Structure formats: C-alpha cells, structure tokens
A protein has these predicted regions:
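Membrane-proximal transmembrane or re-entrant/amphipathic helices at the cytosolic face
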Residues: 406-442
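Transmembrane helical elements of multi-pass membrane transporters/channels
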Residues: 4-19, 144-145, 167-186, 190, ...
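Membrane-interface junctions at transmembrane-helix termini in multi-pass inner-membrane proteins
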Residues: 117-140, 263-265, 315-345, 385-387
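Membrane-interface helix-capping segments at transmembrane helix termini in multi-pass transporters
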Residues: 30-40, 66-78, 86-116, 158-168, ...
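Alpha-helical transmembrane segments of multi-pass membrane transport and lipid-handling proteins
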Residues: 52-53, 78-103, 154-155, 253, ...
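Helix-loop junctions and terminal segments of transmembrane helices
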Residues: 52-68, 130, 242-278, 329-332
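Signature of the first transmembrane helix
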Residues: 1-54, 149, 208-231, 419-424
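Hydrophobic alpha-helical transmembrane segments
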Residues: 109-113, 139-190, 345-352, 362-386, ...
Length: 442
C-alpha cells in the first residue's frame, strides 16, 4: 500500500511540475499583466472542474466497480456532474463577461477552455484505485497538462494561435487526450459515457457531504486572487504562480495524508501525524530564513520590494500543509463534522476580513488576515487531534511568523533566526515538536 501511494505521490509531483511549466510558458508568452488575466481564467477552469465533481471522486473510491448496480450509479453520477458543469460554466462565463466585457486574453482563454470542463467528466481514477490499480489510477489524472504543453508549443508558433484562444485550445486538447487515456486504461463498457437522468438523489447527498470540506477550502482559496485582482493587480501574477507552487506541494503531501485515513486510530498513524507536522514546521521556519537570506544576497531591488507580500503567502502555505495532515487525522477518526465547523468559522472570518481589506484597498492586511485565520484553524485542529506544541514547536511557529512580518524590521528577522535554536534542540532531544495532550510535557 505504501509503495502504491509513494508512486502516486511521484506521479502527482510530475503532473504538478508540468502544471508549473505550463504556467511559466504562459507567463513568458503574455508577460506579467497578460498572465494575470490568463492565469485567473485558468484558476476558474480548475475551480469548475473541482466543484463539478460533487464529491463523487471520494464516493466511488469506496465502491466496487464489479458490483451489480455500479454502472447505473456511475451513469447517474455522470448526469449530476454534467448538470453541475453546465451550470458552473454558465456562471463562469457570465462573471467573466461582467468583469471584462468579453474582451482580453483571459476571456478568449476561458471560451477556448470550456470544452475541457466537459472532457474532465471522463475520468476513471476513482474506480481504478478502488480496483487496487493504484499506479494507473494516479497516472490517468496527470495526462492533461503534459499533453497541453505539447499542444501549446505547437500552436503558439502558428499565426492567430499565439494568444489566449490558442492557450485555451491547447488545454482543451490536453483534456481530450486525458479522456481518451482514461477510457483506454479503464476499459469499461461504452455506456459509461451515457448519463442516466433517473434517480440518484441519495447518492448525490452522500457525495456532497463528502466534498463539503474540500468545497469550503476551495471557495476560500479562490476568493483571495479575485480580491487581489482589484486591490493589487500588480501582485496578482506573482500570487497565482506562488499558489500553483504551494498547491503542487500540498497535493504531493496529500498522497501521504491519505494513508492516515486508514491508520488514524493506530499508534503509527498518530506518530506519523506528529512527525509530519513537526517536519513542516521546522523546515518552514528554516526555509523562511533561507528565502530572506537569498533575497538579501542575490535579490534585485524589485524582488526585495515584493518580499513583504510574498512571505505571508509562503507562511500561509506552510500552515496549510500542517493543517492538511491534521485534517486527515480527524477525518480518519470520523470527526469531520467537528472539523467542518472549525473550517466554516475560520473561513467565514477570513472572508469577511479579506473583503473589508479589499474594500479599503489594503492588500497587505488582506494577506495577513488570511494567514492569521488559517493559523487559527490549524490551532483548533491541533486541539481536536489532542496534540500540543512543545516549546520548540512554539519557537518554530513564532520564527515563521516573525520572518513573514518584514514590517518589524531587522529586529524581527534576528529574533526569528534566534528562535531556530530551541527548534533544533527540541527536534534533536524529542524527535518531535508536538506531544499528545494526555502526556505530561517532558
């Protein structure tokens, strides 16, 4: 099992590497300003693909494709997903038209990428994983971006195809190749591609409950770039690229988190949770110092000017990675209801604070509002898991936050560096920055 998930993590990492490469190619093609429009449109595509799943990717992970009624259930799910996709596509186009008036490279990309939302419905990763075909199940999810890169490299040299429309067509072609690969690898009957409209209401409700956690997080994640589009358009391209980088790291990490779902009640699962969170905290605090030192030594004046914006985003990403491990532990213990309450409360506070900051055209408070609310969610999740931070864990967290708070000046940076000493001591002495709440802290 571990080997299967490790191979899945490697495949996911390769897929995310291709996603980053595609974004870099778009950045080179359109420049900072143009990439802001196209990158936001691509983010919309990913949002539609995720929301239109309706939780069925999780639901069909636990269903046997060999069961008698599986084909009927799959076709009913396909009907629900098709309706959701069409509704989301309509809302996406209407929102983009209202924002851009139907002009610009971003809107052209959107229209050309619309077929990808329908082609994305043809995916058999969940039933492949349910069959135990883990390598195939992980692999068929990562075909679209390599194919899109190949198509874009071919199209952008042709007259009339070098703009947003050509990039969108390349993405649609990538998802077409992925759909064909899914059909070929899974080898199911052709009628799986035909939606069935009758029934499936109870199944839909189950899928939506399973996806509630992911939907809440995705909607919250997508809010920030849309607010930055008006509050700080110059920073938006950088934020989008950082988002893809952090999202890729989070996705790779989640391949390991899935093991916690089966081992949440066992001592190995609990130790793994403590080890992973400790590793993320320690490396994040150390990495923040490395970023600051590298920027000071080799960064240009323009790059250093963006550091007060970049550091809170990176700190938020590090805390999200830790929170993902804690969430997997809670879901494995069947405490997703408690986790959902924490997420809804934290995301609601974050959204309100971000909206207020955007209304005042205060992008830095917007980024810090998001960071602090995500931190609050992580702390609450830590409590729900029955875990506490050792002094070294507190030091790592404070070091990360101080490194992100560049408005404190050199004093904050020095204090953040000094705090790495107790982090190193705790990691060496206890092999962990956390301990179970029922234990007396050593």
């Amino acid at each position: 099992m571990r080997a299967g998930f490790l191979s899945g993590a490697v495949l996911y990492a390769l897929g995310q590497g291709c996603t980053l490469l595609f974004q870099w190619l778009l950045l080179r093609q359109f420049g900072m300003q143009g990439y802001g429009e196209v990158g936001l449109a691509h983010l919309g595509l990913l949002t539609v693909l995720f929301l239109a799943d309706l939780g069925y990717a999780s639901l069909f992970l636990r269903e046997d494709p060999a069961s008698a009624d599986w084909v009927v259930r799959w076709r009913r799910a396909l009907w629900h997903r098709l309706l959701a996709t069409l509704a989301l596509d309509l809302a996406w186009v209407a929102g983009a038209w209202w924002q851009s008036g139907g002009q610009g490279e971003g809107f052209a990309y959107l229209l050309a990428a619309l077929p990808a939302t329908l082609l994305g419905l043809v995916g058999y990763s969940a039933p492949l994983l349910a069959q135990g075909r883990r390598l195939a199940g992980f692999g068929v999810q990562q075909v679209a971006m390599p194919a899109a890169i190949a198509a874009w490299l071919a199209l952008r040299g042709m007259p009339g195809w070098e703009g947003g429309m050509g990039a969108g067509v390349a993405v649609s072609l990538g998802y077409l190749v992925q759909a064909v690969a899914n059909v070929a690898v899974f080898g199911g009957p052709p009628r799986l591609l035909l939606p069935e409209a009758a029934g499936g209401g109870h199944m839909l409700g189950t899928g939506l409950r399973l996806s509630a956690l992911g939907i809440a997080g995705t909607l919250h994640d997508r809010l920030t770039p849309f607010l930055l589009a008006s509050a700080a358009p110059a920073f938006l391209p950088r934020y989008l690229f950082l988002g893809y980088l952090i999202g890729g790291a989070s996705g790779v990490f989640n391949q390991f988190n899935r093991l916690l779902l089966a081992e949440a009640h066992n001592d190995p699962g609990a130790r793994w949770t403590r080890s992973l969170v400790s590793l993320v905290l320690a490396l994040s605090a150390l990495g923040a110092q490395a970023v600051l030192a590298a920027a000071e030594a080799w960064g240009t004046a323009a790059q250093q000017a963006w550091l007060p914006w970049v550091m809170p985003v990176l700190a938020t990403g590090a805390i999200v990675l830790s929170g993902g491990v804690l969430s997997a532990q809670l879901i494995g213990r069947h405490r997703e209801s408690a986790l959902l309450r924490v997420l809804v409360c934290g995301f609601s506070c974050s959204a309100l604070l971000q909206l207020a900051a955007a209304a005042w055209h205060a992008p830095l408070p917007l980024l810090w509002s998001r960071l602090l609310c995500i931190l609050g969610i992580a702390v609450a999740s830590l409590q729900l898991c029955g875990l506490r931070l050792r002094p070294g864990g507190h030091a790592a967290l404070w070091s990360l936050l101080l490194a992100a708070a560049l408005w404190l000046g050199a004093g904050g940076w020095v204090l953040a560096a000094v705090l790495l000493v107790p982090v190193a001591w705790s990691a060496w002495r206890h092999r962990s920055l956390l301990y179970p709440a029922q234990e007396t802290r050593p």
